[in-house]
Every structure is written in C-alpha cells, then in structure tokens.
Amino acid sequence: MSTYHHGELRPALLRAAAKILEKEGREAISLRDLARRAGVSHGAPYRHFADRQALLAALADEGFALLAQALEGKPWREQAVAYVRFGLANPQRFALMFTRPVPDPLRRLVEGDAVAQATWAMVHGLTHLILSGHFAGEEPEALVRRTLAEVRFAQRSA
C-alpha cells in the first residue's frame, strides 16, 4: 500500500528521508529503502533524485530553507538563538547541511560584514559545541544570549 498521494512522491521521499536522517544518520538512507517504505517500485525515487547524493543534497537544501524561515524577520540576537535552536532540533540535518556550500541567500546575510561573519562563526561554533556535549547542564538559549552579551561588552570595552 502506497504511503503518498499521486504526484507527491518527491516530498514523501524527503519526509521519510528526514526521519531516517534524524533517527539513524545519513548512512542509513537509501533510495531502495525509501521506495519500499513509500510502497513504490525501487526505480520510482530515481525519477526525482539521480542518486543518493542528489537526495542528500535535496535534504540539505531543504534544511537551509527551513533555517532561513526560522531566521526571517528576527533581530540579530533572536536570529542567533533561532540558529542554535534549529541546530539542536535537527542535529543530523544541521551536520549534513554544512557538508555542502551555503546557499547564496544565507551567504549574502553575512557577506562583506565582518561583525556578522564573526557572529555567525561564533553561533555556529556554539551550536556544534552544545551538540557535542561541551556545555552539558547549561540551557542553550541562555548560553547564546550570555555569550552574545559578553561579546558586545568586550567590543564596547575595546
């Protein structure tokens, strides 16, 4: 029995792949398994993705789009918190996203702005450190806000 509506196989495959990614990691994703789960022929996913790498690229692109939505319209401090929140909620996708080039819309947010680049680097690094357990016991959003406040204080004091 098929688990998708006609004409919606690509989004169904991406949803299933995203679930596998977060539960089992990217190594567990295969087009054949996704076809089986969707109840379609093993060749059907190839109408939407040339190969496994194309599927992973689509997952990463979708992740960047979701991240952009999470950041949109927020002041920079809230963007920093939203960035960390996104990474913590989607650790496997977050890691996958940064195995590829950052898309132009996100790259342009920091391009040519040294403070924005430094803030992104700091927040991205904090996200990875939190994910790897280096700030165990600390509330992530409070950590981000405190770190940003300390950096702003240091800038004013310099």
Predicted regions and their residues:
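Amphipathic alpha-helical linker/stalk segments
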Residues: 61-79, 102
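Short, hydrophobic secondary-structure boundary micro-motifs
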Residues: 30, 95-98, 138-139
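Helix-turn-helix
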Residues: 12, 16, 20-54, 58
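Hydrophobic/aromatic-rich alpha-helical bundle segments in the mid-to-C-terminal region
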Residues: 103-151, 155-158
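Short hydrophobic clusters on alpha-helical segments that form packing/core surfaces
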Residues: 13-21, 63, 67, 83
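Helical hydrophobic small-molecule/effector-binding pocket
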Residues: 77-100, 120
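N-terminal intrinsically disordered/low-complexity leader segments
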Residues: 1-8, 19, 158
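Alpha-helical DNA-contacting segments of helix-turn-helix folds
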Residues: 21, 55-63, 97-101
